[in-house]
Amino acid sequence: MGVDQLVETIIPYNLRSIATHLYVPPFTIITAIWTYVWLNIFGYEEYYELGMLGYAAIFVILALVLLFCHWMMPVRCFLMCSKQEDVRIASHVCVIPTQNNGWPELVKLMRTTRDKQTKLWFEFQRVHYTWDEESREFQTKTLDTAKPMVFFQKSHGFEVEEHVKDAKYLLGDNKTEMIVPQFLEMFIERATAPFFVFQVFCVGLWCLEDMWYYSLFTLFMLMTFEATLVKQQMKNMSEIRNMGNKTYMINVLRGKKWQKIKIEELVAGDIVSIGRGAEEECVPCDLLLLRGPCIVDESMLTGESVPQMKEPIEDVEKDKIFDIETDSRLHVIFGGTKIVQHTAPGKAAEGMVKSPDGNCICYVIRTGFNTSQGKLLRTIMFGVKKATANNLETFCFILFLLIFAIAAAAYLWIKGSVDETRSKYKLFLECTLILTSVIPPELPIELSLAVNSSLMALQKLGIFCTEPFRIPFAGKVDICCFDKTGTLTTDNLVVEGVALNNQKEGMIRNAEDLPHESLQVLASCHSLVRFEEDLVGDPLEKACLSWCGWNLTKGDAVMPPKTAAKGISGIKIFHRYHFSSAMKRMTVVAGYQSPGTSDTTFIVAVKGAPEVLRNMYADLPSDYDETYTRLTRQGSRVLAMGIRKLGETRVGELRDKKRENFENDLAFAGFVVISCPLKSDTKTMIREIMDSSHVVAMITGDNPLTACHVSKVLKFTKKSLPTLVLDEPADGVDWMWKSVDGTIELPLKPETKNKMERKAFFNSHEFCLTGSAFHHLVHNEHTFLRELILHVKVFARMAPKQKERIINELKSLGKVTLMCGDGTNDVGALKHANVGVALLTNPYDAEKAAEKEKEKKAKIEEARSLVRSGAQLPQRPGAPGAPPAANAARRDAPPGARARAPLPPMANAAQARLDNLMKELEEEEKAQVIKLGDASIAAPFTSKYTSIASICHVIKQGRCTLVTTLQMFKILALNALVSAYSLSALYLDGVKFSDTQATIQGLLLAACFLFISKSKPLKTLSRQRPMANIFNAYTLLTVTLQFIVHFSCLLYIVGLAHEANTEKAPVDLEAKFTPNILNTTVYIISMALQVCTFAVNYRGRPFMESLFENKAMLYSIMFSGGAVFTLASGQATDLMIQFELVVLPEALRNALLMCVTADLVICYIIDRGLNFLLGDMF
């Protein structure tokens, strides 16, 4: 049964006792049968090794079954549990989450009894699910908030303590406690992962082959890597835990009295009093603001540095149903945010709660992990384990390699079994080693490093990611969608002027020349609020108020400039109907006192989309449509204004009237024309994205004509093709495409069914869809929409839900989508896109960062000079807690500076200054740790800067990660295939490597494996796009053909080695390793082939640094290659003795070097040739 966005399915189970686990009877019977066969049919003494091998095989299979129970929840449930139809008699439930929301878990079903009623519940990812008898399904018990506003306005909280207990019992308290597991617990969890278990199994096999050094070296490397990851995971979890709210006391209304309780004791339904508190005091949970407006810093949740204004619902229509989706932005204070300013509520209306301390009155609607902050914490917390590559592709690729390994192992077993004297135990061991060789120990480490390197690189660029598994998707992106306002254009809007009725000479560009009515609308119709010395609110409204020169005071009064004409008085705002994306307008009821009278004249001021206000005017200007259409075609944002004087009324009566009563019989007050300049680098970045083979589209809530103008400027649409707009017709029936200039009119769908003619229709026009047209196509012409949507470059007048639907439609067509928005209106689209990037509005961050860096450098320089003068460093160099900046100062310390005698009094001032500098630098280093505000609830990727250059960075890193993964698979596959041959055919010739040789080989190639994942992307995106997956003609062909070349080289060189090997002693596989010409030849050429594989298959440009630019990788290949050449040429005799090698004959040595050179050249030609023909080269 589907439950919610987090949980897909819940299946009830009962745990079986160990004796009744389904795997116990089969293995008991198999073990008994094998014992009988071995002892009574084969014979104990004659087939001792065979008997032990049988037991070993049974034990390994049993261990695998148990591990599969641990790894795979369906297997565990099938073998260890019995399914229950009735959840009420179940002991556990198997919880399967929705895609990308964690992993399945078998959780205990809890039972809590109260008042003779039993509550069935369980906890999954810190969310409580309770069994509901009526609906017969598990539900997250949250407060039902879909109630009329009057319910909340008249609420007085819990009047009886019993009701508090009931709410706590049903809905839970406000705890957001996170328990960080112990190191050992987390290490065991990682140590039972499939790859780790497999690697430990391989280490055991190598030990049986008497390769102790190599086995222990590999095991140490694996355990160190896993321990490092566990430590990092624990650190991350500790930081997440610290992000939770710190406890403090809060005023709550219970039993008709105000009392102080801890924030953890709050329950949904409480009434609280909250205001600006201490620095560390965050809002404890999600609150509905009942009385008293406030300004909130939401940067901890959204990352936005601009404070948000929150309005109380005390003046909202009583019958309006509260919708948490649409009303939360204006009326809900989210948990984890901070109130930076609040206004004491006014006189309480009848039935409303009075504030005990002048703070805001709020209603608790969500607590604990059900809050927005709780959801973000869970996203980060349960996203820790997601830093992996495509597991399905990895598994399939290993299966592909396993085919070769099985063939090699079968060859060895058949050939080896011919000789009856050979040990079957040794033969079986060698066959097992061949099968395991196709999964290199480096694979999981490499895949983790590739993703983690990209994470770190993005962090340095100010881009933070909560879902690392999405990084490779960025390399596969087909279409990039952008919001317009605030994303492509700046927030620094410019008011061009006001166009009035029949204004033939253009628009009024000076506010002083405006009619009084137009000024009144501009000055009063806004949601701005004064915060300290700044205005907080919509950038468009700030631009309008600034342009007309009026000044907003703290009491919602707007005062004219001192230079204003006589007779113009200030305006007091009494009631606001805030702007919403759905209604596309804002209405304000305000009042002013005419000169010489104390009576208040009330006015209604309305501002919004011209097409929405069109039917609200008492007298519509004749050129209304023509004027706003002409202005929007020029790329300007146009808002219509209307005003109406109200008759005599009282302030109290205003609140009782509905919005519709005010929005009619308006007088036209003009069109305010606003230009939205493009960001300085938007054109350059869009060109780079388009030049890198991506389709681009704009999804905006703005006017279609304005959006089409911007799309033409940015070359989303071609100037040579007409842009057709589909908008709602006047009759609502005849849907027609109309060109922006009005010269072309075409039917909705091309009448022809001929594919070529339809293709010509789509290719000869550019398309723009409006929100109403999109709604029509979704519900009436969905087949045509799927055909059309990939050709639409502009989506205008789109509501947030429609933006989300567009992304889902594109994904359903198999397109990998990227959405870039501002993180507020675009949350749904950002979440549903394969790659969602939220740009935060922090225009001064870059400058501040540069200033801080400058200050830091100055401090380091001052510290260095103090050290040179003899001041003593407060911490030893290289200490675990020492910041890099402190270490920079230490580098210039004179010898013995740390261990000097106590300083003379005259040096105390310098010493104190140095100590302070070091403390400041250390604090700065600590401040760079990621905080909750760095991540956003809006999107998987959050950029701290407003530039869409972030999109290019994300795509570059995505491509780099994809290509790195692909080249790693190629290299590891080739090495595994060569290894499989060496272990099979050559094993029968007596070829084996010593423990020392295997260890040295591992050490030499370890650096290559490390630096291959550290590749950095290029500074610009390439036109070519990387292949999206491992399984393609290029990869399979290049691996196969390169292996054939390697195989041929091995055969040729081994043949020469056999001829050069004068010692023709019979092969003794049990004998202790002794170096000879054959062993030495195979060891050197196998190492040489592996180095060649790295050199040939390193991808480099156009997606990442070339081999010559990646110095670390180049030097590691050169060092390994140099070591191989030295050994092959026989120049370092002592080194060869140390490596247990013999000096090769000159003819064999020369042949070997020539063969390796030929292998390198031929493999390079094969790889680049196939890439040119089948790959992503051109």
Swiss-Prot record:
| Amino acid composition bias (Low complexity), ranges on this chain | 870-904
Q: Which residues cross the membrane?
A: 17-37, 44-69, 186-207, 212-230, 395-414, 429-450, 971-990, 998-1014, 1033-1056, 1077-1099, 1111-1130, 1148-1170
Q: Which residues bind Mg(2+)?
A: D822, D826
Swiss-Prot/TrEMBL catalytic activity = ATP + H2O = ADP + phosphate + H(+)
All ranges on the Extracellular side of the membrane? 38-43, 208-211, 415-428, 991-997, 1057-1076, 1131-1147
Entry superkingdom: Eukaryota
Report the membrane topology from the UniProt record: Multi-pass membrane protein
Name the Pfam families for this protein. Answer: 2TM_P5A-ATPase (PF23143), E1-E2_ATPase (PF00122)
- The primary site where this protein sits is endoplasmic reticulum
Q: Name one GO molecular function term.
A: ATP binding
- Topological domains on the Cytoplasmic side lie at 1-16, 70-185, 231-394, 451-970, 1015-1032, 1100-1110, 1171-1178
Keyword annotations from UniProtKB, A to Z: ATP-binding, Endoplasmic reticulum, Magnesium, Manganese, Membrane, Metal-binding, Nucleotide-binding, Phosphoprotein, Translocase, Transmembrane, Transmembrane helix, Transport
Into which family does the record put it? Belongs to the cation transport ATPase (P-type) (TC 3.A.3) family. Type V subfamily.
Protein name listed in UniProt = Probable manganese-transporting ATPase catp-8
State the gene name recorded for this protein: catp-8
